């Protein structure tokens, strides 16, 4: 299934993917999702926040169901597995259950959450945040991409109705349990399949360092107000302070104005991603770095601890050779975290990543581990929908 979509949004030079939300690549992937649903006789539909759902059974008649899935968008120059592995595995797990003649006692759905990475509009998990009401629809509509297009304009151009964005209780009420399968994004998982215990609290902050543009040659050092220096200090401080606090901090995106090689900049805008096991330490780091910059919090996701009873049960079912699957925390954000925070019983399965590389073209999972992931997911779906084959 991943081979079907391996060319979509791929940079042939680097092998990296660019699948921004609502780009033509994303539209193609959404179509692929709908096609996969139709091929299996699942009822697919797009909710008013742009998330896709493919139902086996009817949740409006049979009550809330078990939802599995992930996302299809990518970071810039991302890998092939982050997101699509969870969507493809969800369809495959349903195939496996049906092949066994399994009849679930409640509906099962495959979900694809829109704009999980936030690569285009800066806020991650836009689809699940809107669905659960943690992202204000007015704020969402006014988010702009680098070309200056607002989400409102982009959705309108794609024939959607941005006026309908916002918390969607009707859709949410259909989700009894959510299980997301995802490629592991570090090297912590040694077994083929693992289960998430928690997601570190994490956020993104925009730092605006302001100065005065001037000539790179004729302006004496004592006359300069160069924001690049403040930015450079912040980058180095982020690293040292993060190590001191036991958290992770990264400036991964920067924009310079006016961006001339022979001029002192007037403005350096940089984005800090910071996360760690303890909220206070992440917060303390951001406060320490804020000197000399105007700081705007663009997103914040509190720590998520997955339902303990559910994760223990999932680990038992997803284990191999009679051993429960290992349970581990993750430093990566996921739609599963947003749903868990909204009170939906939620679990996550991870598929081993041999190199730990993620959000980069080298992201990889062995095909046999992906198959183990599908088998584990199918076993979890069967266990949670209680029927027998
Ligand atoms: Zn992901």
Residue ranges and their predicted role:
Residues 4-6, 69-70, 325-375, 379, ...:
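Zn-dependent metallopeptidase/amidohydrolase metal-coordination segment
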Residues 18-22, 250-260, 270-277, 294-311, ...:
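A short beta-alpha structural unit
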Residues 7-8, 149-197, 235-239, 300-352:
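Active-site-adjacent substrate-binding region
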Residues 10-57:
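A non-catalytic alpha/beta surface segment that caps or lines the substrate-entry region
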Residues 115-116, 122-280:
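Midchain, well-structured core segments that form catalytic/ion-binding scaffolds
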Residues 215, 219-244, 351-389:
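His/Asp/Glu-rich mid-to-C-terminal helical/loop segments that flank catalytic regions of hydrolases
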Residues 1-23, 114, 140, 297, ...:
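N-terminal capping segment at the start of a domain
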Residues 76-147:
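A generic, well-ordered mixed alpha/beta core segment in the N-terminal half of proteins
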């Amino acid at each position: 299934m991943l081979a079907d979509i391996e060319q979509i949004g791929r940079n042939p030079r680097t092998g990296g993917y660019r699948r921004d939300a609502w780009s033509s690549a994303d539209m193609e992937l959404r179509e692929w999702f709908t096609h996969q649903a139709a091929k299996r006789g699942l009822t697919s539909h797009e909710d008013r926040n742009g998330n896709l759902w493919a139902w086996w059974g009817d949740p409006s008649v049979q009550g809330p169901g078990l939802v599995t899935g992930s996302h299809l968008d990518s970071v810039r120059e991302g890998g092939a597995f982050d997101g699509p592995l969870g969507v493809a595995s969800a369809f495959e797990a349903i195939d496996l259950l049906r092949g066994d003649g399994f009849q679930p006692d409640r509906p099962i759905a495959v979900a694809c959450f829109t704009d999980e990475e936030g690569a285009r509009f800066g806020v991650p998990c836009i689809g699940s945040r809107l669905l659960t009401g943690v992202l204000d629809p007015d704020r969402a509509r006014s988010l702009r991409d680098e070309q200056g297009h607002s989400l409102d304009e982009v959705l309108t151009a794609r024939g959607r109705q941005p006026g309908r964005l916002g918390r969607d209780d009707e859709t949410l009420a259909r989700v009894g349990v959510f299980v997301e399968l995802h490629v592991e994004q570090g090297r912590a998982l040694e077994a083929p399949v693992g289960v998430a215990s928690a997601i570190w609290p994490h956020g993104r902050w925009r730092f605006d360092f302001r100065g005065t543009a001037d000539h790179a040659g004729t302006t004496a050092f004592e006359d300069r107000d160069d924001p690049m220096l403040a930015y450079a200090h912040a980058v180095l401080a982020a690293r040292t302070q993060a190590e001191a606090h036991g958290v992770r901090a990264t400036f991964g995106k920067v924009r310079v104005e006016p961006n001339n090689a022979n001029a002192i900049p007037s403005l350096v805008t940089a984005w800090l991603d910071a996360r760690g096991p303890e909220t206070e330490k992440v917060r303390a780091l951001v406060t320490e770095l804020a000197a000399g910059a105007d700081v705007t919090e663009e997103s914040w996701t509190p720590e998520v601890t997955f339902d303990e009873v559910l994760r223990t049960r999932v680990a038992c079912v997803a284990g191999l050779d009679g051993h429960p699957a290992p349970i581990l925390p993750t430093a990566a954000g996921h739609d599963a975290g947003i749903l868990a925070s909204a009170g939906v019983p939620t679990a996550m399965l991870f598929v081993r990543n041999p190199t730990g590389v993620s959000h980069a073209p080298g992201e990889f999972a062995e095909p046999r581990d992906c198959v183990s992931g599908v088998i584990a997911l199918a076993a979890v779906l069967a266990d949670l929908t209680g029927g027998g084959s």
